Amino acid sequence: MRTLAILAAILLVALQAQAEPLQARADEVAAAPEQIAADIPEVVVSLAWDESLAPKHPGSRKNMACYCRIPACIAGERRYGTCIYQGRLWAFCC
């Protein structure tokens, strides 16, 4: 029974240690000023494209679908750059 209590205490300390950086980051994001363009106040998307990573064959872009994802691209996609949306960095995946 004592071992179970010790393991539970270690688990709670580990969870609390991980939660503190998340709370600090959430506070930083909330404190950051909104980056909203005057002409389009709803959405601001900034893309950084690395041309050296782009597909070389013109036909290969025909059916390419790209998305901004957090935290990383899913299986079968490749990261081609970075998106900035609502002050957060997203992976630009195709």
Curated annotation (Swiss-Prot):
GO terms for molecular function: pore-forming activity. Keywords: ADP-ribosylation, Antibiotic, Antimicrobial, Antiviral defense, Defensin, Disulfide bond, Fungicide, Host-virus interaction, Phosphoprotein, Secreted, Signal. SMART domains: Defensin_propep, DEFSN. InterPro entries: Alpha-defensin, Alpha-defensin_C, Alpha-defensin_N, Beta/alpha-defensin_C. ADP-ribosylation drastically reduces cytotoxic and antibacterial activities, and enhances IL8 production. Phosphorylation at Tyr-85 has been found in some cancer cell lines, and interferes with ADP-ribosylation. Residues 1-19 form the signal peptide. It is found in: Secreted. The modification Phosphotyrosine is found at Y85. Pfam families: Defensin_1, Defensin_propep. Residues 20-38 form a propeptide. The modification ADP-ribosylarginine is found at R78, R88. Disulfide bonds join C66-C94, C68-C83, C73-C93. Its main location: secreted. It comes from the Eukaryota. One of its GO terms (biological process) is immune response. One of its GO terms (cellular component) is Golgi lumen. Tetramer. Dimer. Interacts with RETN. Belongs to the alpha-defensin family. PANTHER family: ALPHA-DEFENSIN 1, NEUTROPHIL DEFENSIN 1-RELATED. Effector molecule of the innate immune system that acts via antibiotic-like properties against a broad array of infectious agents including bacteria, fungi, and viruses or by promoting the activation and maturation of some APCs. Interacts with the essential precursor of cell wall synthesis lipid II to inhibit bacterial cell wall synthesis. Inhibits adenovirus infection via inhibition of viral disassembly at the vertex region, thereby restricting the release of internal capsid protein pVI, which is required for endosomal membrane penetration during cell entry. This is Neutrophil defensin 1.
